[in-house]
From Swiss-Prot:
Residues 127-153 are annotated as: Disordered. This is Large ribosomal subunit protein uL3. GO terms for biological process: translation. It comes from the Bacteria. InterPro entries: Ribosomal_uL3, Ribosomal_uL3_bac/org-type, Ribosomal_uL3_CS, Transl_B-barrel_sf. PROSITE patterns: RIBOSOMAL_L3. SUPFAM superfamilies: Translation proteins (SSF50447). The keyword Ribonucleoprotein applies.
Amino acid sequence: MKKAIIGKKVGMTQIFDENGRVIPVTVVEAGPCVVVQKKTVETDGYDAIQVGFGELREKLVNKPRRGHFAKAGVSLRRTLKEFRMEDVANYNVGDEIKVDTFEIGDKVDVSGVSKGKGFQGTIKRWNASRGPMSHGSKFHRAPGSMGAASDPSRTFKNKRMPGHMGAKNTTVLNLEVVKIMPEKNIILIKGGIPGPNKGTIVIRNSVKA
């Protein structure tokens, strides 16, 4: 059975296992999410559910989206995501998806938008090697060779160059759920996940599990 939920990254901390070893964990406020729309093969050509997360004031929502929520009979939500599901018949519009969907020990994939780093050079962005920093060298952190001059007289596509770093959709695979607190809608995931604190993330079953 596929599992998926939208959440908000709270931050990182550490817990101790039964042997006293330190485990770094990320705290995520996951759900409750509400099913806003159900899509089926008959109506849309594929099976999926559209899920909303996070409360939102009416003045911040445009008229078409307000109508979309009104049709579903649910309160306004800040984030909408669509999840492909094989068991879509088990869901109805208005159903809540809570953090206890997952269990301790589950392997999950976490998706989010990575932290933006702005414009960065090749050393930070691509882990390129730098030149000598002393002894008369004038080559320190420059990009280096970008291609031949007369032939082919251009820089090849996909050449690793300076540019905007971060702020991209990123997924970390095969993380472990170490603790769940359903009364607080909190889930603790072993290791780090993409994005800044308060960033929106999506937790799914691991594709490798």
